[in-house]
Regions:
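N-terminal entry motif of extracellular EGF-like repeats
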Residues: 80-81
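A beta-strand signature from Gram-negative outer-membrane beta-barrel systems
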Residues: 1-20, 91-93, 114-117
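Outer-membrane beta-barrel initiation region
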Residues: 84-88, 98-102
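Outer-membrane beta-barrel channels and translocator barrels
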Residues: 9, 91, 102-103, 139, ...
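Short, charged beta->alpha transition segments
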Residues: 94-97, 187
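Surface-exposed loop/interface segments of Gram-negative outer-membrane beta-barrel transport/assembly proteins
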Residues: 11-77, 118-213, 231-333
């Protein structure tokens, strides 16, 4: 069972305004990094694998005449990719609440700001929320109220392929080559691989979400035992996701494919109208209630995705998809 308590301001002394402010800050840290083989252990393993032959025993043995992929092991610089892509995280949370009542009117207003710097470099979240609850007694027969919640969220989506860092990127692979450019190639297999440091510094992955939840109601006592209640509410969600891989991305730079941009927009709307008529009666030690009503509801969803690649520079990033040599679109309604 989940019980949700809605604050309305009724509990305060009439005519008094109550204000409360709460804040906390916390920190996050990777407690235990997975233990990875040292560069020397890793190099020894690869050299042994490269010189392994069946041998007369059938169990395999190393042939010293075979060429080894890694020569001078002692001179290999080691790159700690785990350390490069992580950091100490931080969370800040602030709540401000204002409530009160004037006898016939109760109100509650709150503001919340949540800010997080993720433990992965370049990731984070900022959320701002405003909530309003308002109830008033217009006269002896009529009561009305409003519920409103606004939330705006900006997320710096993780730019790093974390699995690749653990399972594919070698500790002997350097961040930069001798010319100061980001490396893009596995030094053993020769295949292209993303560079996590380049991803963190240059890729763009922004998500914006705005949600509006609103409801208004009115109750009217037609007779002492007969009450009409009507309410209308809406739930609106707007989502935008911007992504951009720049021209300086080592793989795209190596392949000469230019920048790549993608933008997704989605909108979800819902409208709900509820109408009820309630008759309540007590006769002696007995009571009964009759409820009748109807509901109207409509939900819609639309999504538009567009992309472009082949842009010659990173000046406008995802803000002008027409600059791309290749364009794509996808629409859902």
């Amino acid at each position: 069972m989940i019980i949700v308590n809605t604050k309305t301001g009724k509990s305060g002394k009439e005519g008094k305004v109550n204000v409360s402010i709460n804040h906390y800050t916390s920190f996050q840290q990777v407690y235990n990094y997975p233990e990875m083989a040292s560069v020397n252990d890793w190099a020894d393993y690869w050299n042994e694998a490269a010189t392994l032959i069946p041998g007369v025993s059938g169990f395999g043995e190393n042939d010293p005449s075979q060429a080894t992929p890694i020569g001078d092991i002692s001179g290999i610089p080691e790159v700690d990719w785990q350390d490069l892509i992580t950091r100490d995280g931080r969370i800040d949370n602030t709540d401000i609440n204002i409530s009160g009542n004037t006898g016939k009117t109760n109100y509650f207003i709150s503001y919340n700001r949540f800010y997080q710097e993720g433990i992965i470099e370049g990731s984070g979240l900022e959320r701002n929320s405003i909530r309003l609850n308002f109830d008033t007694k217009v006269n002896d027969k009529l009561r009305a109220g409003v519920r409103l919640a606004l939330t705006d969220r900006r997320q710096e989506v993780n730019k790093v392929n974390f699995n690749q860092v653990y399972f594919n990127i070698l500790p002997i692979r350097q961040i930069y080559d001798v010319n100061g450019n980001y490396t893009a190639v596995n030094p053993i297999s020769g295949t292209t691989q993303r560079n996590p440091v380049s991803d963190i510094n240059h890729r763009i992955r922004h998500r914006f979400v705005t949600n509006i939840l609103a409801n208004a109601y009115a109750e009217y006592n037609i007779l002492p035992d007969l009450t009409l209640r009507t309410s209308v509410g809406t739930n609106l969600t707007f989502n935008k996701f911007n992504r951009y891989v720049p021209t300086v991305d080592p793989i795209r730079n190596l392949q000469g494919t230019g920048g790549k941009a993608d933008v997704d927009h989605s909108r979800k709307t819902g409208v709900l109208n509820e109408n009820t008529l309630t008759y309540s009666k007590e006769i002696g030690a007995h009571s009964f209630k009759i409820l009748a009503g109807f509901t109207l509801q409509k939900d819609t969803f639309s999504d538009l995705g567009a992309g472009g690649q082949g842009s010659a520079n990173d000046v406008v990033t995802f803000n002008n998809l027409a600059l791309g040599a290749i364009s794509t679109t996808n629409t859902i309604n």
